[in-house]
């Protein structure tokens, strides 16, 4: 395991990374002032670090100039920053994005799962950028067990994030394999958050922390403590919020989290849009606001 991957693994252990959204208008325009205030607010409210341009941040859809500007604003906050790379049809896209992330001071990259040779893709990123990587077991493209073992032996891989949503056995497998390989087991399980910690996850990188950060941070804090009732209560609050935001159509969760961020005053209404997700009925917005405590039940 490369020393840089060891350093990232150890730095992230026990932390909550907010998988930040990218606030934008209905037409996809990004206001960097809004982005700066939004990212700073996530950190102020309990995020130990930031994952930008990942699945929640719609990284594959954004131009290199916008990507660079978002990374710069995240890095300026002085917390660990992980950048999502890959997911675009460009063959060299992930390697180019990783080089940019490294040059701008990011601490690591979260590698979108791709078709074909996943290990080869990680190796190409490692050769191009030499930046520590977090593998990604995502519900839209789960990682086969043998491939996962190979990835977790790569010297540049610091850990793996599991985001399988409802596959408890798959989540448990990823956590076990990561720990056996001496890598960091990172939960991205918004719908199995408390259980994934009990199964051995050592850090969190979740889209649920794109708003209402304190709800997720309270679960992490309670888990580190010794009060089982506090952990149960905090997990219950998180589960109620996740039930309203991480539901079918699942890709709509980004829009739901942006609605919640707007309800909290983190972003203006004009920038609470996800033009890349499925259309959602307006009545869902009220359900999300109620789950977040912004409308009476």
How should each PLM-predicted stretch be described?
Residues 2-6, 17-21, 45, 198-201, ...:
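C-terminal alpha-helical cap/extension of soluble enzyme domains
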Residues 30, 37, 65, 69, ...:
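Conserved active-site and cofactor/substrate-binding residues in soluble primary-metabolism enzymes
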Residues 69, 73-78, 100, 104, ...:
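Alpha-helical structural signal in soluble globular domains
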Residues 139-249:
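Catalytic alpha/beta core domains of metabolic enzymes, predominantly
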């Amino acid at each position: 395991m490369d020393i840089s991957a060891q350093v990232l693994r150890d730095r992230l252990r026990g932390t909550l990374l907010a998988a930040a959204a990218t606030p934008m208008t209905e037409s996809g325009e990004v206001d960097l002032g809004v982005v700066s205030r939004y990212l700073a607010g996530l950190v102020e409210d309990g995020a130990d670090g930031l994952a930008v341009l990942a699945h929640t941040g719609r990284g594959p859809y954004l131009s290199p100039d916008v990507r660079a500007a978002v990374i710069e604003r995240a890095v300026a906050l002085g917390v660990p920053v992980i950048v999502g790379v890959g997911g675009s049809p460009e063959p060299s896209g992930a390697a180019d994005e990783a080089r940019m992330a490294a040059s701008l001071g990011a601490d690591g990259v979260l590698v979108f799962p791709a078709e074909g040779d996943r290990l080869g893709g990680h190796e190409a990123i490692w050769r191009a950028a030499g930046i520590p990587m977090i593998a990604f077991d995502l519900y839209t493209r789960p990682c086969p067990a043998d491939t996962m073992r190979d990835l977790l032996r790569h010297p540049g891989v610091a850990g793996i994030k599991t985001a399988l949503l409802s596959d408890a056995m798959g989540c448990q497998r990823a956590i076990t394999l990561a720990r056996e390989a001496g890598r960091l087991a990172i939960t991205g399980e918004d719908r199995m958050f408390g259980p994934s910690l009990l199964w051995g996850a050592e850090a969190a990188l979740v889209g649920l922390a794109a708003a209402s950060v304190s709800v997720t941070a309270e679960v992490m804090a309670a888990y580190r403590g010794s009060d089982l009732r506090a952990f149960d209560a905090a997990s219950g609050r998180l589960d109620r919020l996740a039930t309203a935001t991480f539901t079918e159509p699942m890709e709509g969760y980004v829009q739901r989290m942006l609605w919640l961020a707007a309800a909290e005053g983190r972003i203006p209404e004009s920038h609470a849009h996800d033009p890349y997700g499925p259309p959602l009925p307006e009545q869902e917005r009220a359900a999300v606001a109620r789950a977040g405590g912004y409308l009476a039940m």
